[in-house]
């Protein structure tokens, strides 16, 4: 049987709730095109790192991060209402670079395939 840490279960709940809060409660246009990709909660449940990407963008705009930080207090308050935890974790927002990295890898693989096709057609 697989053992799950409580922090992992809380992280899943926090991810779901923050995604819902961003979708339904935040009206700031700077954060309207965000997707929450992951949440890491510390073992003591006091800190949560929220990873996000901007739809259609390879990198995060500074205005987006600023908008999230401004809305952080409101998001934390909403989490406190929705989750039954003794402590609501402090929220740290971080852009998720894994999508940009994956996009770059995909681009390199496509370039290699194009070069192989060009080399094969020359002979």
Curated annotation (Swiss-Prot):
tRNA-binding recorded as keyword: no
Broad class of the protein's primary localization: cytoplasm
GO MF, one annotated term: ribosomal small subunit binding
Gene Ontology terms describing biological process: maturation of SSU-rRNA
Any single GO CC term annotated in Swiss-Prot or TrEMBL for this entry: cytosol
InterPro entries, per database record: KH_dom-like_a/b, RbfA, RbfA_dom_sf, Ribosome-bd_factorA_CS
Keywords, in A-Z order: Cytoplasm, Ribosome biogenesis
Keyword Acetylation assigned: no
Compartments reported by the entry: Cytoplasm
One Pfam family here: RBFA
Known partners and oligomeric status: Monomer. Binds 30S ribosomal subunits, but not 50S ribosomal subunits or 70S ribosomes.
Function: One of several proteins that assist in the late maturation steps of the functional core of the 30S ribosomal subunit. Associates with free 30S ribosomal subunits (but not with 30S subunits that are part of 70S ribosomes or polysomes). Required for efficient processing of 16S rRNA. May interact with the 5'-terminal helix region of 16S rRNA.
Family statement drawn from the similarity comment of this UniProt entry: Belongs to the RbfA family.
Protein name, entry field: Ribosome-binding factor A
